[in-house]
Amino acid sequence: IYQRTTKDMIGPAEAIPNLGGISTADRAKVNNATLRNRGWELSVQWQDKLKCGFSYGVGFNVFNYKAVVTKYNNPEGLLFNNHTGLPGNKGYYEGMDLGEIWGYQADDLFMSNREVDEYLKKVDLSFFKSSDRWQRGDVKYIDSDGNGKVDPGKGTLADHGDLKKIGNATPKYSFGINLNAGYKGFEVSALFQGVAKRQFAMAGAQYLYGANCYFKEHLDYFSAQNPGGYLPRLVDSSTKDYEANAGYNTTRYLLNA
């Protein structure tokens, strides 16, 4: 069991007054941030040698940790905006778990254009694209905060609209197994490593873009012949339709490892 605190990490300085054409958003970088790691590690090793000269060994280790930002100059409470639709900010905030994934509740696809029309009467989805572009096979975003529209609000801790923490990309468990054997001066060894309980947001160009779509899993997309498809309908990657369906973190396309 351990705790490690890393101080004087690089973070933004105080905002520069808006004088002489310098924007308050243009902040210098200084050593003023702090990160705290807490975790544990378990390791077991067995080594033996037989009378015939054959030796062997096996080892196993597993560890878990959580890294939390305890000091960071972000008085506005701006959120990390990877694939959320928020502009600009790529910072952290105090209390943030490293690796956290913010996204939208969206578990289903629209099954019919009638469903699209009925839903758009109740929920405004114009943050993603105009109402006339929505069709069956598009991602169905949920109005999580109940205000009649889906958007990220002001993108802050105090007002993040329908954005919420949907997962974390940091592995909860990391483990390894090592094997070794030896006989008369010859030795062989093997090492296996892995992680468990980790999320991955399948948004942006990482998996669903252009020439990257060459796995058989990409064939499981929504169509009239495949209404139960996992992926949304096929669209041009240069359009708002693509961005709305594949450009945002959603619960539907949050993968678990």
Describe each model-derived feature in a short phrase.
Residues 1-257:
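Outer/extracellular conduits and scaffolds centered on Gram-negative outer-membrane beta-barrels
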